[in-house]
């Protein structure tokens, strides 16, 4: 029985990245659909759940992707609600790669040092990766703050994270180097989740900070989000601080993404969202 992966993408075009990883994760065929919404996904789900029976059903799976996490979450919920009884297939959510990227980064930090009770700051924490990273850090028992261009926007995103993960998150302004330096002054952990090619933290803000123990940056394109570290860093020490660059994190992210795809075909009842993906990341880190 061929392993079929259906990519339900909320963007105008299905993701090439997710298609490639789908094949590398073990799918025999990946079929992508664009502009998928909760309103039009019903017939697509029907095609996955009514065509195969018994153990053959586990050879069909759904991946929800696209660049917008809010749209992805709404679509993911609609897909799950369309299942009933034995009429279901395994499904995974990874809009914008946020679940796998954030999970890989935080899992590596958690392996390096205990995070419970530590002060963690997620720079540019209102994006999909930043919000998921904040959630995972909070799950580990860290005291989490996220930054954004305005404190108001950061606090709004913090409320969303709190509701989703049942943790406490604070918001802080981080529009300038000075504001971001102030935000990380007392931090033990810094997770930089900004846009590609945008430096968020100059070396002067962290190099001699005695509080900072761990640094993570998911920006692989120069200038990096954290000045002074390398994209390939995976636990490299800088002045007593352990750093993880985007490529150092990315190796685990890709392995994790592929492993999640493989697990979709192990049963017809798998549901892989933030918590499930993070648990797997910790096993693999």
Name each model feature, range by range:
Residues 92-110:
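A glycine-rich, Thr/Ser-enriched phosphate-binding loop motif common to dinucleotide/cofactor-binding enzymes
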Residues 35-39, 70-74, 100, 104, ...:
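Conserved active-site and cofactor/substrate-binding residues in soluble primary-metabolism enzymes
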Residues 1-86, 276-285:
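N-terminal ligand-binding/catalytic initiation module
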Residues 169-244:
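Rossmann-like adenosine-cofactor binding region
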Residues 102, 127-133, 154, 198-201, ...:
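Short glycine/serine/threonine-rich phosphate/pyrophosphate-binding segments
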Residues 221-285:
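Adenosine-phosphate binding glycine-rich loop
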Residues 84-92, 238-240:
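Glycine/charged-rich beta-loop-alpha catalytic/anionic-binding loops adjacent to active sites
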Residues 111-189:
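Glycine-rich phosphate/diphosphate-binding loop of Rossmann-like nucleotide-binding domains
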């Amino acid at each position: 029985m061929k392993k079929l992966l259906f990519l339900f993408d909320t963007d105008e075009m299905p993701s090439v990245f997710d298609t490639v990883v789908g094949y590398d994760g073990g799918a025999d065929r990946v079929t992508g659909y664009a502009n998928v919404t909760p309103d039009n996904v019903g017939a697509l789900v029907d095609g996955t759940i009514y065509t195969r029976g018994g153990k053959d059903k586990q050879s069909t799976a759904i991946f929800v992707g696209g660049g917008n996490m809010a749209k992805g979450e709404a679509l993911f919920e609609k897909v799950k609600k369309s299942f009933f009884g034995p009429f279901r297939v395994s499904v995974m959510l990874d809009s914008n790669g946020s679940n796998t990227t954030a999970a890989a980064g935080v899992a590596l930090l958690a392996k390096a040092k205990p995070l419970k009770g530590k002060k963690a700051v997620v720079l540019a924490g209102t994006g999909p990766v930043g919000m998921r990273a904040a959630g995972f850090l909070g799950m580990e028992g860290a005291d989490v703050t996220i930054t954004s261009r305005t404190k108001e926007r950061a606090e709004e995103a913090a409320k969303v994270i709190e509701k989703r993960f049942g943790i406490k998150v604070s918001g802080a302004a981080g529009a300038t180097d000075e504001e971001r330096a102030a935000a990380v002054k007392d931090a033990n952990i810094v997770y930089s989740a900004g846009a590609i090619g945008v430096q968020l933290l100059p070396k002067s803000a962290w190099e001699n900070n005695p509080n900072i123990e761990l640094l993570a940056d998911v920006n692989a394109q120069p200038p990096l989000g954290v000045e002074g570290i390398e994209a390939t860093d995976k636990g490299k020490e800088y002045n007593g601080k352990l750093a993880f660059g985007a490529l150092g994190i990315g190796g685990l992210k890709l392995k994790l993404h592929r492993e999640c795809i493989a697990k979709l075909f192990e049963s017809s009842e798998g549901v892989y969202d933030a918590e499930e993906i993070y648990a797997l990341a910790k096993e693999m880190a």
